[in-house]
Amino acid sequence: MSYFTKTPLLALSLLALSPLALAGKLSIVIDDFGYRPHNENQILAMPTAISVAVLPNAPYAREMATKAHQQGREVLIHLPMAPMSKQPLERDTLRPDMSSDEIQRIIRQSVNNVPYAVGLNNHMGSAMTASLPGMQKVMQALSAYQLYFLDSMTIGSSQSSQASAGTGVKVIKRKVFLDDSQNEAEIRKQFTRAVQIARRSGSAIAIGHPHPSTIRVLQQMLPTLDADIVLVRPSQLLNEPTRQYEPQPQQPAKPRNPFRGIQQCRVKQPPEPMKNDVFFRLVSSSIQESAPVMFIKHRWQTWVAPAETETPAQP
């Protein structure tokens, strides 16, 4: 007798859980918190799975980090790092030429200024994250605080993953910037792109900012998320397998040769019909060890087995 025949409830429960198990995971992080409480409070009115990254030297850094944490949100340190371009830098911006002691001092002060932080991501930082020696010093400092690193990927040649080797610091990477342009149509396009990547690759991290246009787009589009997309915190993606989503290039079509002559179609042998019991055995064997099934089996033993043992024996 097959496994499903013995426990039909298991099959029904599995079918109910399968959409959740296959849902695309979308993480949204809003950077630059700590300067504009009015805008930031509108972000804090959104679902608590949306996380915030707080600039450590911003005037409202501690206040906004505490408020976000009290709501159950994930808080990150949004640490300024040196860009390739020459522009005014915030105080305590990390540079590749800094000593390990100086980097440790800045990170220690940032941890004090942004309470409840569980991760850190870079503000700008194309020059810093492209430097392997510089990022190795950052990862060594982060390892003392058990913070993960969310790479904002401001440069394609980032060395964050290589630099984390041997430090125990976990690295995850941004897939989409929502608001490089503050045009609402462009932000919607980027939001849709993030959803598509989450659906096809299993997960995606999108980064935005508390601009009025970004806030309006999120207010409009978050309630319309499809059922196969679930909002998650960045830390929930730390152990996700990394699957790069890139559209597959299409092979150029071969030109037709009108002089190939007449080709005869080969008669294919019809496939042998599969019996129902064989089909269910194959399906059962492929999913019995999945997480939803193991959960239900455990619950089944908890709910049903005790009831069976308590039934008095018949004389």
Language-model segment annotations:
Residues M1-L9:
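Bacterial N-terminal signal peptides that target proteins for export
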Residues L22-Q87:
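Active-site beta->alpha N-cap acidic-glycine motif
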Residues K25-S27, A49-A53, G72-L76, V118-N121, ...:
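Structural preference for beta-strand elements that scaffold enzyme active sites
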Residues A16-P19:
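N-terminal signal peptide c-region/cleavage motif recognized by signal peptidases
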Residues S100-F191, R199, H209-V230, Q236:
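Catalytic domains of cell-wall/extracellular-matrix polysaccharide-remodeling enzymes
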